[in-house]
Amino acid sequence: MESMLTLAHLQQRRSRRWLFGLTLLLLVTLLISLCAGEQWIPPGEWLSAKGQLFIWQIRLPRTLAVLLVGAALALSGAIMQALFENPLAEPGLLGISNGAGVGLIAAVLLGKGVLPGWALGLCAIFGALLITFILLRFARRHLSTSRLLLAGVALGIICSALMTWAVYFSTSFDLRQLMYWMMGGFGGVDWQQLWLMIALLPVLCWVCLQSQPLNLLALGEVSARQLGLPLWLWRKLLVVATGWMVGVSVALAGAIGFIGLVIPHILRLCGLSDHRVLLPACMMAGASALLGADIIARLALSAAELPIGVVTATLGAPVFIWLLLRSRGRG
C-alpha cells in the first residue's frame, strides 16, 4: 500500500514537472512569436509607435489565433484517440475538417468573392457542424465505434471529392483563394476574426473539464459501460465539441494537419496517459507546436511567407510514418 502511494506521488510530481515545462515552453514561443518578423521588436519597444502597429495590430491577433487553433487541434486529437481507441486518430478522420472545407469553398464560389470574412467563417463552421450532425444520426443507430469511424472516413472522402470538383471548375481568382486555404495560413488574421477566437474559448474550457469520462472511454467501450458511463451521450457530446473546434479552426486558418495526430500521441509516449494531465498538456503543447511552425513559416523566406500547413506537414509527416511503423510493430 505504501509503495502504491509512493508511486502515485512520484507520478503526480512528474505530471507537475511536465505541465510546468510545457507552460514555460508556451511562454517562450509566445514571446518569440510577438517579437519575430521582418523586424525584430523586443518587449522594451512594444509601447513605441512602431510597436503599436506591428505588435498590437498585426502580430498579437495572429499569435492569439495560432495559440487557440493549436490548442483546439491538439485537444480534438486527444478526444478522437480516446473515443475511437486508436492512437492514430486525428480531427480530420471523421471528415469534419473536409466538411468545413466544403462549406468554405461553397461560400467562395457562390459568393463570387464579395462575401465578407465573417460570412466565410460561418460557412466553414456550418459545414463542419453539418458533417457532425450526420455523424450523430449514425450514432443514434447505436453503431459500434469502429463503424462510426468508417462512416466518418466515408464522409471525408465524399467531401474531398466535392472540393476537388470545385477546384477544377473554379476561376483563376477563386482557385488562388482555394489553394491558399487548402495549404493553411494565418496571414489574413486580424482583430476582425476576434469573434472566432472567442467562439473557441468556451468549448476549449469545457473539454478540459471532461477528464473523467475520457479516462473511462480510454479503458474501452465494455469497461466504460460497466462503470456506468452513458456511451451514446458522451459520444454525441464529444463529436459535437470536436466538430465545433475543428470548424472554427478551419474558418480561422484553413486546413492544418498533423497537430491533432502527433501532439497527443507523443505526450502519451512520455507517460501522460491520465486525461486530467493530458488535456491541459495537449493544449499547451499544441499551441507551442503551432506557434513554432508559424514562426518558421514567417521567417523561412525573406520575401514571402510559407503556408503553415506545408510546415506542419513537412515536420509532421516523418513523425506520422514513425507512429505507423511503431503501431504496426506493436500489433
Swiss-Prot record:
Subcellular location: Cell inner membrane
SUPFAM superfamilies for this protein: ABC transporter involved in vitamin B12 uptake, BtuC (SSF81345)
Top-level lineage group: Bacteria
CDD domains listed in its UniProt record: TM_ABC_iron-siderophores_like
Keyword Transport tagged: yes
A Gene Ontology molecular function term of the record: vitamin transmembrane transporter activity
Primary location: membrane
Keywords carried by this UniProt record: Cell inner membrane, Cell membrane, Membrane, Transmembrane, Transmembrane helix, Transport
Membrane topology (UniProt): Multi-pass membrane protein
Annotated GO biological process: cobalamin transport
GO-annotated cellular components: plasma membrane
Residue ranges crossing the lipid bilayer per the database entry: 18-38, 64-84, 91-111, 114-134, 149-169, 194-214, 243-263, 277-297, 305-325
Function recorded in the entry: Part of the ABC transporter complex BtuCDF involved in vitamin B12 import. Involved in the translocation of the substrate across the membrane.
Self-association and partners: The complex is composed of two ATP-binding proteins (BtuD), two transmembrane proteins (BtuC) and a solute-binding protein (BtuF).
The family this protein is said to belong to: Belongs to the binding-protein-dependent transport system permease family. FecCD subfamily.
NCBIfam families (alphabetical): PRK03784.1
Name of the protein: Vitamin B12 import system permease protein BtuC
Species name: Klebsiella pneumoniae subsp. pneumoniae (strain ATCC 700721 / MGH 78578)
Lineage: Bacteria, Pseudomonadati, Pseudomonadota, Gammaproteobacteria, Enterobacterales
